[in-house]
Amino acid sequence: MARLFGTEIPNEKRIEASLPYIYGIGRSTSKRILEQAGINPDIRTGQLTDEQLTKIVQVITTDGILIEGDLRREKQSILKRLTSINCYRGQRHRRGLPVRGQRTRTNARTRKGKKKTVGAQAKKK
């Protein structure tokens, strides 16, 4: 298996489908990287030469694409900033509620967690 930026990418898949194994690179970014590097997207990852791998790494670093740890750190710092300035989005993140204006009276179960029943008690005899 080829190793790029600390991530093992499968040898048997096409390089176009293997690059998205790296956190921060999707299908469209993968196509753009291969186009800039001048590599055929249909080549299997195991068939790539060392020069082609270094060309891919060079394109990713020169384009300023955030990947792996840098991207995770960036996302975390953005969330930390939102919560520290106490804006609406930060408050929603802190409370674990939907951030982008979705309704919460019904639905939003994924974000809110398991349903907690309140107020329904059986009568004592």
UniProtKB/Swiss-Prot annotation:
Located at the top of the head of the 30S subunit, it contacts several helices of the 16S rRNA. In the 70S ribosome it contacts the 23S rRNA (bridge B1a) and protein L5 of the 50S subunit (bridge B1b), connecting the 2 subunits; these bridges are implicated in subunit movement. Contacts the tRNAs in the A and P-sites. PANTHER family: 30S RIBOSOMAL PROTEIN S13/40S RIBOSOMAL PROTEIN S18 (PTHR10871), SMALL RIBOSOMAL SUBUNIT PROTEIN US13M (PTHR10871:SF1). Belongs to the universal ribosomal protein uS13 family. It comes from the Bacteria. Keywords: Ribonucleoprotein, Ribosomal protein, RNA-binding, rRNA-binding, tRNA-binding. InterPro entries: Rbsml_uS13_C, Ribosomal_uS13, Ribosomal_uS13-like_H2TH, Ribosomal_uS13_bac-type, Ribosomal_uS13_CS. GO terms for molecular function: rRNA binding; structural constituent of ribosome; tRNA binding. GO terms for cellular component: cytosol; small ribosomal subunit. This is Small ribosomal subunit protein uS13. One of its GO terms (biological process) is translation. Residues 92-125 are annotated as: Disordered. Part of the 30S ribosomal subunit. Forms a loose heterodimer with protein S19. Forms two bridges to the 50S subunit in the 70S ribosome. The gene is rpsM.
